């Protein structure tokens, strides 16, 4: 499992770290990653990040921790 904790980042910095993590996860063949955003400003933006991300299939909040998301990564296309 790959986990990304975005606590302590600004929204812009958090987006860059998130985007790099999803791209890395795609190319490494991960099925999903956990992204911790907390309950602040980033949590308001996070679902839009996932919708716009070409490497993400879907994202779901963890029931036990609403500040964390399970991000399902798209399957890697052969040769890419």
Predicted regions and their residues:
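N-terminal targeting/trafficking signals and adjacent low-complexity tails
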Residues: 1-80
């Amino acid at each position: 499992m790959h986990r990304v904790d975005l606590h302590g980042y600004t929204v812009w910095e958090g987006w860059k770290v998130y985007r790099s993590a999803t791209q890395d996860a795609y190319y490494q063949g991960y099925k999903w990653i956990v992204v911790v955003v907390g309950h602040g400003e980033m949590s308001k933006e996070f679902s839009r990040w996932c919708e716009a991300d070409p490497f993400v299939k879907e994202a779901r909040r963890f029931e036990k921790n609403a500040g964390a998301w399970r991000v399902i990564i798209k399957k890697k296309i052969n040769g890419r």
